[in-house]
Amino acid sequence: MGQFTGKTVLITGASYGLGEGFAEGFAKEGADLVLTARSKDLLEAVAERCRALGSKVTVAPGDVAVEEDVIRVVKTAIAEHGKIDALINNAGVSDMRGVAPEQYDMTTWNWILSIDLNGAFMYIREVGRHMLENHSGNIVNICSIMGSGANEMNVIAYTAAKGALRNLTQQLGCEWADRGVRVNSVSPGFIITEMVRPALEGMGMDKWIASRTPMRRIGELSEIVGPVMFLASDVASYITGHDLMVDGGTNASNGTYQIPPIHHEWNKDTTPKVGTGYPGVSPRPDWYQVMEMGIPGIHYPLPEA
């Protein structure tokens, strides 16, 4: 028997990347799963692998930014499994175009916050209400070291959202502490996932990041799965309102501000320069395809050759 046998875990953003890793990790430890993300096909692929590990899996597609979808997914989870023991609030997006703050458009800002903050809160609220009724439950929010200090990556909306989610974790961790519900977060550093792969490969950041991480390497997926499972487990029963940094020592060394500067020149004028990236490094064209797919109604032209 695994440490999560008999427990149901709801994972948002479960179709790939960190969410996929969390799903398989919990399945290996006996948990039953409710997986949600926008793509049913991608979710089913993850679900099949988890079922092969012996997990009962419910696939519940939905958009984390749509309140009706969040409510429906939570109701489905309770109807199918009878309870939710743990919520892994993982769904998130970022903007790797490198747009300077003074040039940032509100459409992109609102899109990122609608998922990274508003969507996360709606899941906390809906699942939290259920857990409070049962006087039992664990919530683990996936934050980021970007939410704990300044950085030079020009991901201003992502930074704001993750910082707010970290503070929300601390607030609810205290408010619900005597009602049987623990709320914690994990703040990853750079972990190899599909979300950060464009930055690592397209901008040649892997060596830069490693050089500014005390462990001198980038984290692996398995190295974030374990800490998240720890906080969701009974082993962490006296931990709440805590943000666990899993970053190879980056934050402790003040490394969040030592990532190489992208746009020093941008602060000297107000000319929009979307997507110029690092000096001497061309952004990958598929960044713009991903951004165009991710933000409805927005078109990001490829940079001029």
Q: Where in this protein do the model-derived segments appear?
A:
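Conserved glycine-rich cofactor-binding loop
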Residues: S15-G17
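Substrate-binding pocket helix/loop in short-chain dehydrogenase/reductase
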Residues: G98-P101, D105-L113, I209
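A short, exposed helix-loop element centered on a Lys and neighboring polar residues
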Residues: I124-R125, Q170
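Alpha-helical segment proximal to the catalytic Tyr-Lys
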Residues: R129, C174-D178, S237
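C-terminal helical subdomain
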Residues: S185, K207-I239, V246-G248, K273-A305
